[in-house]
Amino acid sequence: MKINKLVLLAFLLLAFTKNQAQEKKLLTLKEAVEIAVTNSDDAALAKTKVETSKLELDNTKNNRYPSVKASGQYLRLSSAHVDSNIQSNNDSGSGSSSGSSAPLKIDQLMIGQVNVAMPIFNGFKLKNSIKESESLYKAETFSEKHSKEQIGLEVVDLFSSLFKAQQMTMLIEDNLKTADQRVKDFTAMEENGLIARNDLLKAQLQQSNVQLSLDNAKKNTAIANYKLITLLKLPQDTEVEIDIEAVKRDMASNQGNTSLGERNDLKALELKKAASESAIKIARGNYYPSLSLTGGYIAFDLNNVLTVTNAMNVGVGVSYDLSNIFKNGKQVKLAQSKAKETEIAVSLMNDQIKEEVFQAQQNYNLSLKQSLVYGKAVEQATENYRIVKDKYDNSLSDTNDLLEADYQQLQAKINQALSKADVAQKYYELQFASGKLTSSLNITQN
């Protein structure tokens, strides 16, 4: 008996711990977007691309500095024979001849050198390469900002889906309570012969349909919640609760903001166009020769024969690829063609953005009108159900009328709840199309 009590206590403790593990987190839309643009993988990828582009720019700038190369060699020689016209000091005396001198032992060679080259002129290719890299780096920074706008829009969509699913779950649960009570009442009435069994079956059928709708709504809630916490990198057992009142306040506070937004993806593309124009200049630079200032130092030692130190040199180097006279024309045309592609892409994006803004504005206007209509529909459906219920209680209407009025009332409430989410969603879609989504939430992009 004591063991059974311990098992029961352990089971209750485990159940309590599991319930405690279900962490509920109240989130505003602003908080969710801030978390997403900081923690999501897409944000990390966009940031890494910016860092990579910055490193590419720094590497290009490094080409402005002189290149310094140092090298050294130590060679071991065996049986080396050296012919030299350099007369040794030992042979400079007059009349002293003691026969042929002993052969020199030459068994090693050491060479050390340092070379410096400083580019002076290369057809302005270096200057334009830096401009190209700077434009691409700036373009990547605007692409990162646009990525954050896209992440924000994804959060808005998930917020809307989760809110809709939660509202449907709540409304259907309330309706299921009514359906359960109706089945109990109809069962008692059928047993007392007050209604036909067919009416009870209709009520039970509606009860089953409501239960199926509730199960589907709970499934949609779980999926939307999972997608949101995955995007936000929250613990997997987190249950997000949406602060809809904060969403309304944020929307209301931003209604007076009439500042013009700019699409960061358009800015990025315009900067890529500038980079393509620099690429044309780089290609044209191949028509010019390259000029550089060179200098060096060399030390040389051939054992027992020759030692050279402090041998410094300074000069100018010129190089020119004659084949560029014939080949480079294609490179220039290729660069010009790519620049033309980018120019057309900018024009297309301008038109696309105008269409997106217009469509988003129309969708937002429609959502506002629909919200008003759905609000009136709830009042009408509620009053209709009250009237039909009174008639049914007084045997002036049948079960079909009652169940239909109940369904219409539920559908009207669901439509009203969904329309609230639609208004917010369409509003922030308009902000995204205008390039103002994060700024409308007072989120500063670095």
Give a label for each model feature:
Residues 20-22, 78, 236, 415-446:
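Acidic, low-complexity, intrinsically disordered peripheral segments
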Residues 21-69, 73, 79, 232-277, ...:
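Bacterial Sec-pathway N-terminal export signals of envelope proteins
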Residues 27, 55, 150-260, 367, ...:
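Periplasmic alpha-helical coiled-coil/stalk elements that build and connect Gram-negative outer-membrane
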Residues 44, 67-85, 101-107, 117-146, ...:
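Small/polar (Gly/Ser/Thr/Ala-rich) solvent-exposed segments
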Residues 45-60, 147, 151-170, 188, ...:
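Amphipathic alpha-helical coiled-coil segments
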Residues 94-100, 262, 299-300:
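Extracytoplasmic loops and strand-loop junctions of Gram-negative outer membrane beta-barrel proteins
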